[in-house]
């Protein structure tokens, strides 16, 4: 018979194994694997008081991936408590391959968001890792004009061996059925793109609206640093 300590360790390992992805940076609002399929923010509806200073000029998003292939997108909601209004796309849906550490580099805040230093917002990462729909995790941020140092970028941006990204033709939302992917893949460096309205996307779970395209990567693939 297992001791209480062994049972606790076993339960912890089971929880970790069943998680589909974990948002490591910026600091996540909260995580509960049983609620991670709840929109918005994996069931954590209340903004955190522990906000991450996020440079207007761009910063990485660090994920811990628990699948070998996942569709991912990144959206932004503006304000102290955006509720379900995540109406700015920071990264359109792309395919990530490889487990463990995955970094999206240079996630920029588009000028169309009209954010300035000291204003609050929330980043939401969406994936298709759940058989019944999407998975959602959020990070509450405060905008800053101060860029990250090289050491800070290195601390918050790591890719495991073999991790790649791939563009998706006609991408919808990451929580939808996968579309066929294009042949472009690899470790593309990021570039800025002008924000444009996108009305063709299907609703993100129960929410729908006009999305503005923020920073995009070369060839449609996510940036790896």
Stretches found by the model and what they are:
Residues 1-2, 24, 169, 201:
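Selective for proline/serine-rich intrinsically disordered segments
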Residues 3-19, 213-220:
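Cleavable N-terminal signal peptides of Sec/SRP-targeted secreted and luminal proteins
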Residues 13-193:
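Mature extracellular/extracytoplasmic regions of secreted and cell-surface glycoproteins
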Residues 3-4, 83, 121-123, 203-205, ...:
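Mixed-charge, polar/low-complexity N-terminal
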Residues 1-4, 225:
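Positively charged n-region of N-terminal signal peptides that target proteins for export
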Residues 8, 17-18, 180, 190, ...:
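Intrinsically disordered, low-complexity repeat segments enriched in small/polar residues
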Residues 194-225:
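Cleavable C-terminal sorting propeptides in eukaryotic secreted/cell-surface proteins
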């Amino acid at each position: 018979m297992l001791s209480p300590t062994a049972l606790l360790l076993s339960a912890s390992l089971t929880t970790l194994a069943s998680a589909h992805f974990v948002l490591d940076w910026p600091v996540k609002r909260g995580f509960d694997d049983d609620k991670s399929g709840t929109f918005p923010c994996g069931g954590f509806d209340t903004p955190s008081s522990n906000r991450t200073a996020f440079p207007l000029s761009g910063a990485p998003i660090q994920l811990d991936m628990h699948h070998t292939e996942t569709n991912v997108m990144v959206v932004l909601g503006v304000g102290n408590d955006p509720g379900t209004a995540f109406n700015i796309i920071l990264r359109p849906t792309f395919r990530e391959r490889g487990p463990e550490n995955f970094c999206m580099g240079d996630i920029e805040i588009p000028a169309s968001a009209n954010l300035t230093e000291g204003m609050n917002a929330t980043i939401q990462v969406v994936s298709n890792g759940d058989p019944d729909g999407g998975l959602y995790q959020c990070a509450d941020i405060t905008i800053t004009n101060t860029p990250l140092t090289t050491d800070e970028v290195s601390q918050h941006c790591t890719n495991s061996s073999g991790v790649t990204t791939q563009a998706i033709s006609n991408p919808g939302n990451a929580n939808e059925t996968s579309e066929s992917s294009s042949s472009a893949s690899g470790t593309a460096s990021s570039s800025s793109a002008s924000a444009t309205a996108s009305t063709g996307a299907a609703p993100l779970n129960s929410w729908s609206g006009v999305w503005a395209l923020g920073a995009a990567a070369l060839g449609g693939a996510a940036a790896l640093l």
